Amino acid sequence: MMVSGNDAAVALAEYISGSIENFSNLMNDKALSLGLSSTNFTSPHGLDHDEHYTTAYDLALITDYALSNKTFSKIVNTQSYMVNINGNLKQLNNTNELLGYLEGVYGVKTGFTNGANRCLVTACKRKDLDIICVVLGCDTKKDRTKDSINLINYIFNNYSLIGIKNIIETKVDEWNLNNNNYFTINKGISQNLEIKTNESQIPYEYIAINNSNIEKVAISINVNPYIDAPVSSGCTVGKVEIAIPQSSSFSVDLVSCNSISRKNIYYYMNMFLKDYFSLLTF
């Protein structure tokens, strides 16, 4: 990983799967499990082949997954390493020119073939924003470095991480406070119903957003004010729509926090008796 050892990649593939072809099949199975729709592998080393391809987006997804492996993460964040080869020490230097040079960079990998030209995937973290930058097809190392630095600095200068889950839930809490008598529960023994989000449907807790769009995030709550009893806890009663500029919008179900039973004959009898004895007392 540090010095693009294609021979090591082949040795590992043959040891694990018996052949490059078998190992490539494992790679493609993993790609499918990660949801990579524009990637196909024919080798572990990535040398040019018509059927060996990927995209910048898929490379970012692969990198995000790979960085969850502590050993991989440590290797790609290592600038140099001494190895002992038959008693002779040899220093391996990481080919990632941004490692140790640009603030926050902690990996990941350079690449070059005649068909792909100069490529670089970079992982960089500053404060609470952690990004993966991918540049492909650069003519020179200088272009690769310059483009990566420009992209990384642009993101950190123009984007912030916001707690979208907390924003949604705060909005729903405010709605509950301001709409105490919103619901009419037909034949319900109570009219007091509170709502909350179905948390499992919120796709992410945080999202990076352009600073100019933070105030433009729109959250709308849509619920039916008329509901027939009984109402069970966790019953879907509406939706909250979230529109994020320059990002995919999504919706989350709103569910009831409490249950409300339906009025039955015993309820009416009880009310009748209460009214009757109240009149007698009066």
Where do the model's predicted regions map?
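Acidic/histidine-rich, surface-exposed loop or edge segments in extracytoplasmic proteins
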Residues: N6-V10
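Short helix- or helix-capping micro-motifs
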Residues: M1-S4
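Domain-terminus/edge residues, biased toward the C-terminal soluble/receptor-binding domains
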Residues: L36-S37, E51-Y53, Y57-F282
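Mid-domain, small-residue-enriched loop/turn segments at the edges of structured enzyme/sensor domains
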Residues: A13-D64, T71
